[in-house]
Each structure stands twice: as C-alpha cells, then as structure tokens.
C-alpha cells in the first residue's frame, strides 16, 4: 500500500557529490565562554548557532560575537533554535535584534537543525556548481 503516489520526474537530474564538512554547530547554554567563539570562527567555514528560544544568545558573549562576525566576514553564520516547533526569529529578543544590525547571518526559521546542517554542507561543497549567492540558495533550494 502506498500513501503517497509516485510522481514522475521529467527534468534532468543533477547529482552533487561534494560536501564541505568544515561546519560547526554551537549550542548556546547559560555560562558559555566567549573564548570558544574565536576558535570556532578561526577554524570553520560555517558556524550554525543553536540559540535560546526563538532567537536569543547570551548577552555575555554578544559583543565578542559581533566582533568576530566583523573580523571573519567570509564565514557563513546560520542562526537556529532549540525550540522545535516555533522556528527562529532573531527580532524577538533585544540581543538578536541587535545582531541583525551588526552581523550578516542566515536564519533557519522553520527548518530542522538536521536539514540546516545537510543544506549548508551541500551548499558550501558545491558553491561553484550551484552559482549564485549563498543566501538565495539557502532559502530557495
């Protein structure tokens, strides 16, 4: 028994075999030390931040985070959430709202953390083949 009928695919199929595994997931917790951020920004192409609630990071690391975003503008930063069914919205809390002013980052909104990780690894590994701007690719494919 099939619940979802198969739909024939008529377009040409493209296979992308490259993944950029230089992606780091950092989970925001109370008491996180700012010094860990520098190491992450220095060593990874993408930093996925699993933030508090729908969009919060601790005030204690906010200034360091802003500075590192400025110092490493080529790093892709994606803000995600620990709240499974609400998605991310960085404008809800003051720190997140300020981050939108000072840092360039993408938001996962309603994407699961697993899909964000897979998508980012795929995007960065196939950047040239995909062409275009990473933000457009992240939100469209």
What are these regions (language model features)?
Residues 1-56, 140-141:
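Accessory alpha-helical/coil subdomains and C-terminal extensions
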Residues 59-141:
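ATP/nucleoside-binding phosphotransfer catalytic cores, i.e., glycine-rich phosphate-binding loops
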């Amino acid at each position: 028994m099939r619940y979802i009928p198969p739909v024939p695919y008529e377009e040409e199929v493209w296979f992308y075999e490259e993944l950029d595994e230089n992606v780091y997931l950092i989970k925001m917790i109370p008491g996180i030390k700012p010094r860990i951020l520098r190491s992450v920004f220095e060593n990874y192409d993408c930093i996925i931040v699993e933030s508090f609630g729908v969009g919060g990071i601790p005030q204690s690391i906010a200034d360091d985070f802003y500075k590192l975003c400025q110092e490493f503008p080529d790093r892709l930063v994606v803000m995600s959430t620990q709240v499974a069914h609400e998605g991310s919205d960085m404008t809800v809390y003051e720190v997140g709202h300020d981050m939108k002013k000072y840092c360039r980052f993408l938001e996962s909104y309603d994407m699961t953390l697993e899909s964000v990780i897979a998508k980012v690894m795929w995007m960065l590994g196939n950047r040239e083949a995909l062409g275009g701007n990473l933000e457009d690719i992240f939100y469209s494919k």
